[in-house]
C-alpha cells in the first residue's frame, strides 16, 4: 500500500499543470519537461502558473504568429523602476512560441490575425516552428531555443531550418 501511495504521488507531479524550473547546465532536451507549453489532445496548452501576454507594439517575424507566456515563481513578484527595466526574480521563465496557420497541415497561411487566446489553436491546423525560453538564473538571463518536431519541441542551441510552402 505504501508503495502505491509513493507511485501515485510521483505521477501527480509529472502531470502538466504547474511548470518546472531547471538550473543552468541542467536543461531538459524536450520542451514538455518544463511543463510550460505542450500539446494535449490536438490543443496547445500552457501551465496553470503561467499567463499569456501580448505586446502593445508587436514585432514582425516573417508573418509568424506568437504565443507569449510569462511564469513567475510562486510567492514572488516582478519589480518596476521608472529608470530601469522590470526586475524579475530567479526562476522566472518567459516563453515565445512561433507558429503559422496551416489549414491543410502542409503549406502555411501568412496572416497576422489571431486573438491571442488558446481557444482556437487546433494543432492540426497549425505549423509549430519554435519556442524560445528566457530563463532567469542567479547569474542573469539564459536563452534556450526549442524546435518543434511532431508532438514536442527539442532543445537545439544552433537553431534549425524549415521549408514552408506558402499558399
Give the label of every model feature segment.
Residues 58, 69, 74-78, 94-95, ...:
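Sequence context of c-type cytochrome heme-c attachment sites
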Residues 102-110:
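Internal, charge-rich low-complexity segments
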Residues 83-86:
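Short, surface-exposed secondary-structure edge patches
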Residues 11-18, 22, 109-167:
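Sequence context surrounding c-type heme c attachment/ligation sites in exported
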Residues 12-72:
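N-terminal pre-domain segments of enzymes
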Residues 1-9:
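Bacterial N-terminal signal peptides
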Residues 88-91:
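Short, well-ordered loop/turn sites that connect or cap secondary structure elements
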Amino acid at each position: 500500500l505504501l508503495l502505491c501511495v509513493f507511485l501515485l504521488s510521483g505521477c501527480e507531479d509529472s502531470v502538466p499543470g504547474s511548470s518546472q524550473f531547471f538550473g543552468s547546465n541542467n536543461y531538459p532536451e524536450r520542451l514538455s519537461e518544463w511543463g510550460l507549453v505542450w500539446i494535449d489532445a490536438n490543443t496547445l496548452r500552457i501551465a496553470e502558473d503561467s499567463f499569456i501576454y501580448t505586446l502593445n507594439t508587436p514585432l514582425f517575424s516573417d508573418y509568424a504568429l506568437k504565443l507569449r507566456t510569462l511564469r513567475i515563481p510562486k510567492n514572488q513578484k516582478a519589480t518596476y523602476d521608472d529608470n530601469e527595466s522590470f526586475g524579475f526574480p530567479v526562476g522566472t521563465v518567459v516563453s515565445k512560441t512561433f507558429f503559422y496557420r496551416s489549414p491543410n497541415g502542409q503549406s502555411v497561411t501568412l496572416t497576422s490575425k489571431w486573438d491571442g487566446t488558446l481557444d482556437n489553436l487546433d494543432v492540426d491546423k497549425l505549423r509549430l516552428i519554435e519556442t524560445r525560453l528566457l530563463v532567469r538564473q542567479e547569474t542573469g538571463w539564459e536563452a534556450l531555443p526549442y524546435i518543434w518536431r511532431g508532438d514536442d519541441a527539442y532543445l537545439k542551441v544552433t537553431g534549425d531550418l524549415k521549408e514552408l510552402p506558402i499558399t
